[in-house]
Amino acid sequence: MFFYLSKKIAVPNNVKLKCISWNKDQGFIACGGEDGLLKVLRLETQTDDSKLRGLAAPSNLSMNQNLEGHSGAVQVVTWNEQYQKLTTSDQNGLIIVWMLYKGSWYEEMINNRNKSVVRSMSWNADGQKICIVYEDGAVIVGSVDGNRIWGKDLKGIQLCHVTWSADSKILLFGMANGEIHIYDNQGNFIMKMKLNCLVNVTGAISIAGIHWYHGTEGYVEPDCPCLAICFDNGRCQIMRHENDQNPVLIDTGMYVVGIQWNHIGSVLAVAGSQKVVTQDKDVNIVQFYTPFGEHLGTLKVPGKQMCSLSWEGGGLKIALAVDSFIYFANIRPDYKWGYCSNTVVYAYTRPDRPEYCVVFWDTKNNEKYVKYVKSLISITTCGDFCILATKADENHPQFVLVLCNSIGTPLDPKYIDLVPLFVAMTKTHVIAASKEALYTWQYRVAKKLTALEINQITRSRKEGRERIYHVDDVPSGSVDGVFDYSKAIQGTRDPICAITASDKTLIVGRESGVIQRYSFPNVALIQKYSLDCRACQLSLNCNSSRLAIIDIAGVLTFFDLDTRVTDSTGQQVVGELLKLERKDVWDMKWAKDNPDLFAMMEKTRMYVFRNLDPEEPIQTSGYICNFEDLEIKSVLLDEILKNPEHPSKDYIMNFEIRSLRDSRALIEKVGIEDASQFIEDNPHPRLWRLLAEAALQKLDLYTAQQAFVRCKDYQGIKFVKRLGNLQSESMKQAEVIAYFGRFEEAERMYLDMDRRDLAIGLRLKLGDWFRVLQLLKTGSGDADDSLLEQAHNAIGDYFADRQKWMNAVQYYVKGRNQERLAECYYMLEDYEGLENLANSLPENHKLLPEIAQMFVRVGMCEQAVSAFLKCNQPKAAVDTCVHLNQWNKAVELAKSHSMKEIGSLLARYASHLLEKNKTLDAIELYRKASYFFDAAKLMYKIADEEAKKRTKPLRVKKLYVLSALLIEQYHEQMKNAQRGKVKGKNSEATSALAGLLEEEVLSTTSRFTDNAWRGAEAYHFFILAQRQLYEGYVDTALKTALHLRDYEDIIPSVEIYSLLALCACASRAFGTCSKAFIKLESLETLSAEQKQQYEDLALEIFTKHTPKDNRKSELNSLLEGGEGKLPTCIATGSPIIEYQFWVCKVCKHYVLAQEISNYNFCPLCHSSVE
């Protein structure tokens, strides 16, 4: 950070000033002094030149108003920026509030206690309240509209300072005896502040200043110290909050009169005076510190007595009240910034975020990329890359070097255990230094990594990509600098203060003035030089022969590293300090292509030096980005950071150096020959290129070729040779015009020469296909069909790249570009167009699979299958059907193309459905795919589960019927399959029998196929018996119930025999009833209590009725069972004795002939009765 005095304003009549305050928002400066002096000034920059911005622009007083109203010396002035009010107070205790009206300041309110003098006034952060403290201990808090909120008398206390906390909840009162008391915003005492900075201090002291930064522009770090308290003896403490037990302590070593934070709380200015041994009088100085107590520099100020200071709103200037003068100093902040490959990288803080906002602004395309980085320390750039040095974690002392590209993409983060206070970067290495040690890291960029290197990356440390050296060591460059962090913690008496590096040299500056030179990248100490200054910034020229040093006082000196000179003792030494010395320098940059050329910033002027001779200065306050090709690029960071979210290209400045300007003037005004001689005397590739271009314009091909040779431009030489082969002068002229980028003019010349082909060729080179198409169509001759097609396709690509698919389709149709057409139809969701395109393509066209995949992605199965089959990919077609759940189509395709995988696909999908408990979906899947046996198994399983739940019997019957129907379909399928195999050789009966035999072999594992209808029969009779019983057909109900004894494996025995006992009892067949009760009482599944209930019931029945059946003959035939059992009518449950009966074609069950006339559907399987 650098600072220098820039302006001085004298107060009339030599009236001594007492206080000064700069309005941060509007730029008004109020200063108060003796004899009631109160002035409001305003400095404004007035310039029409866009290059003169910021500090470089001349400033004039646009306001200089004397405010009348005070009679005594004005001692306190304070601004309310939110409400544009000025509050002042004099030695008589008179307080005046001033307001701005039509460009002038007027009294708004006056107040005078007539008891004591006002020592301090402070507005809170939002400008709503003011706190006024009087010397006699009186405190008044008032509102912005002049109303008193509360007042308090602190007895026996002399007050001298007051300040608000950021949230307006705390007030700090500074006492005349040096104590600071903490109060709440209602005036209640909380505690005394602990003042660590006054430990071991004796004698009387007073408070010089209290300033609490309110965080309005964000903080440089989370939990950053922001409350500064300083005493007249130079002791200072900076606290995070009012109760901070571990504040930052500073001993400024000066007599202090005032302190103030800058606008973002990153710099604390401490004003006062210091005794100098060589002089009798004290010297006025301003010291600058970071919130962490690091000293940034000292500004010496002329005059006898400094009394006050105030920062400008942007933090770029500071106003100092000295005697009867106001001095202004310009501040050149240490911005965190860098420049790499046309990109300006800069960081700033925001009040709404704890991190730094790092902006990568591509100045060429005017695009910006924003990254948020916690605890950013510095930004360093080189070539196309930059390094962000950050703190890894608040609680852990580890740091990170993040390698980024020019759009802010992190490429490689490197964690290190030393503080990267100083960072330098070359094209291959990053060097970071703490105060004691150096760390070097050979970084790799992804595009340069080979497969071998990627494999070896884990062992990279051993191969020397990272090394650490202590600053006191003498490395030899062989195997020194092993990766050992213990070196980094060893202290040193002479800390590092600056570093720089080039591809072959590393320079380290130390606080004593010693400069250490190392070879690089094999770090070996070559030389030590001793200088009389403490370096702040070091810079090597492009061939590493000369070192530029800017010291902490802003003095620029130069050191020749290799010159051998004889010193005063007659000894020959290496290295010489050059005579050139410049003061108030805050930035410098060597030219990348000339070791004797550099640019430097001195105050608000830029100087260019060639061989240590300066050119005339340029007025600017920009930071230098780049210096090459005799052009300097600089950036007005001050302006950018006023509105960092919207950087403007106006803030990038390009300056040509004198030799480039002179050469251009010579060529324009004198001629090529004289200019050629001048450039010969001052050679540079950029000047030769300038000459070559001028010679080309005049068609002086010899001079142009010579100049291109001198600037090593091979393309230029080839172009001149091509021009030499052309016969026509106008043709040469047109080519040169095209070379200089004046394409419209060149095209016009080609067309005037009737060379439409050359005009088309020019537009082809430029990729201007719209114009190519236009030229092709407007020509009188036949257009080249292939070129026309190419143009149509290129225009189609243009529209497609911009997602204008409709426009693209029109051109792709004309260009017959089926591939891109398919893509456009797909993006437009024009599936009809896509289908038509697929139909128009020949078989096995390479685009068909792609189109088919497009159909698959949108679930259009039929079209996808058609496309796959057209390109002879039946497997893909089947996969599509499976993917889109078209299993019947999948099976059909698999069969028609003799594919075997369908079974495994079905099984896989079915298991997936079963995992999700979608059993019915799995059944439907198998049924659609004609896998009836698997579907039946699942359906049977569902029926069994439902039966176990004892839910509605009708539902269970339906499920068993469905299962049985699926089995019947399976039987039919097997018979048909076998018929297909036997090609008419045997009879139908034989083939059907073979089918059944094959089926028997297949179904040995599952016996339920043999009597698939058992479940259905069981529940059919179960329901039928109950229906008959309820309808009063008790005998028929008993006959039906007797059948249920065969189905104990399906219906629980307790239900069967309970129903049988009920039916038998109802039809007075007590013998059957008795057997049913015996069976019930013997069931093991029943509890003792249930058995007892059955016994009691049986006792009740059989005490009244003998256990004998009345009608023997019919029951006996049912009870006998065995092989000779009669068929049963499923409509009535009765045995069929007649020879005439109906057989169901589906379930093969019987119904009495006289009964079937009552039914339209089979009573069991519900198939229609024919």
From Swiss-Prot:
WD repeats lie at residues 12-51, 69-108, 113-152, 154-193, 491-528. Keywords: Cell projection, Cilium, Cilium biogenesis/degradation, Cytoplasm, Cytoskeleton, Repeat, WD repeat. Expressed at high levels in testis and at lower levels in the brain (at protein level). Also present in other tissues, including heart, uterus, spinal cord, ovary, liver, kidney, lung, pancreas and stomach. GO terms for biological process: cellular response to glucose stimulus; cellular response to leukemia inhibitory factor; cellular response to tumor necrosis factor; cellular response to xenobiotic stimulus; cilium assembly; intraciliary retrograde transport; intraciliary transport; liver regeneration. It comes from the Eukaryota. PANTHER family: LD29485P (PTHR12764:SF5), WD REPEAT DOMAIN-RELATED (PTHR12764). This is WD repeat-containing protein 35. The lineage of its organism: Eukaryota, Metazoa, Chordata, Craniata, Vertebrata.
